[in-house]
């Protein structure tokens, strides 16, 4: 499988995906099994990334800042890594100072994550904003400045909705 890196400019994904139910998947954070559906009631910024992806390194600091900005408002950033190697995954988390929850897809191979593929992800980083009802509000392709005034205004508006 070949995974392409997205260009570092904002691109919104297909409009047809907005409003669809986010695909549920199981994950384990610090020995605690969970599912994406367990997070209903929260806004989830679901970010697909990998340690070998330079644009993922580029956006990690602003994802940390976004997570800090939204976590007290019933929202979080959740990373899903397409890393086969647990050491590379752990090293990325430490080296980049990642503060938001992350899960390494244990089925990842050939630079691809079955979880990401189930969402239709073909480039990384790619991010899905999942609303409080478990619906995809937005698909964003490529690295972003997650703490830009435009992004923060988007999340302020989304978090102000019921």
Task: List where the protein language model places each region.
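Short pre-active-site segment immediately N-terminal to redox-active cysteine/selenocysteine motifs
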Residues: 42-44, 48-52, 123
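Thiol/disulfide oxidoreductase modules built on the thioredoxin-like
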Residues: 91-98, 105-157
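N-terminal targeting signals for export/organelle localization
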Residues: 1-24, 162
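A short beta-strand-turn-helix
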Residues: 24-44
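Structural microenvironment flanking redox-active thiols in thiol-disulfide oxidoreductases
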Residues: 57-97, 107-117, 153
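Active-site acidic short loop of glycosyltransferases
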Residues: 39-42, 72, 98-99, 121
